[in-house]
From Swiss-Prot:
InterPro entries: LPS_assembly_LptE. The keyword Membrane applies. Keywords: Cell outer membrane, Lipoprotein, Membrane, Palmitate, Signal. Component of the lipopolysaccharide transport and assembly complex. Interacts with LptD. PANTHER family: LPS-ASSEMBLY LIPOPROTEIN LPTE. Together with LptD, is involved in the assembly of lipopolysaccharide (LPS) at the surface of the outer membrane. Required for the proper assembly of LptD. Binds LPS and may serve as the LPS recognition site at the outer membrane. GO terms for molecular function: lipopolysaccharide binding. It comes from Sodalis glossinidius (strain morsitans). The gene is lptE. The keyword rRNA-binding does not apply. This is LPS-assembly lipoprotein LptE. A lipid is attached at C20 (N-palmitoyl cysteine). Residues 1-19 form the signal peptide.
Length: 192
């Protein structure tokens, strides 16, 4: 009897998750095919944010090429222009000491498509952090973990926004084609 109940519950769970459109992480194609090979430039090429972005791109099957190999600028380029971390007091204890911080990570990046304009991408990630004055060492370790999670989340958002860049590029191409169709034919000057 237990076996049948367990099988029924498991089968029902699989049916519900499959029917509602739920997909496991990494099973959807987040990066357009035009961007499956690209270059990555950063203001801090070996920093933790750039490493997180590089890892997220590789998780999405993006081949990263060195700038030296793309001398003719024929590949799309993701450029991390800058990032900023900010910490604001969210709540205080009765004695006036900070009880909770709201941490913000902002990332400004650009995608440069070959022969096109650049497309700006801005990402912000927010987290709250409880500041317990009795556990100073644990507080520092927890802050480091939260910052690393924020960088990973910002990298995931950057990769997701590559789809919007692709959609904007396609819309620009469609608009250019429509404008070319609407242009009246140029009069030909009579030959003398």
């Amino acid at each position: 009897m237990r076996y049948w109940t367990l099988a029924l519950v498991l089968g029902l769970a699989v049916t519900i998750t499959a029917g509602c459109g739920y997909h496991l992480r990494g099973t959807t194609d987040q990066v357009p095919t035009e961007m499956k090979t690209m270059t990555l430039n950063s203001y801090d090429p070996y920093g933790p944010l750039t490493r997180a972005v590089r890892a997220e791109l590789r998780l999405n099957d993006v081949t990263l090429v060195d700038d030296a190999q793309d001398k003719n600028n024929t590949l799309p380029s993701l450029r991390i222009v800058n990032s900023s971390e900010n910490q604001v007091t969210a709540s205080v204890f009765q004695d006036g000491k900070t009880a909770e911080y709201q941490m913000t990570l902002g990332v400004h990046a650009q995608v440069l498509m070959p022969g096109e304009d650049y497309y700006p991408i801005d990402v912000k990630v927010y987290r709250s952090f409880f500041d317990n004055p009795l556990t100073a060492l644990a507080k520092d370790a927890e802050g480091d973990i939260i910052r690393q999670e924020m960088r990973q989340q910002a990298a995931q958002q950057l990769v997701r926004k590559l789809l919007t860049v692709h959609a904007a590029e396609e819309a620009d191409k469609a608009l250019d084609a429509k404008l070319k169709q609407q242009q009246p034919p140029q009069p030909v000057a009579p030959a003398s």
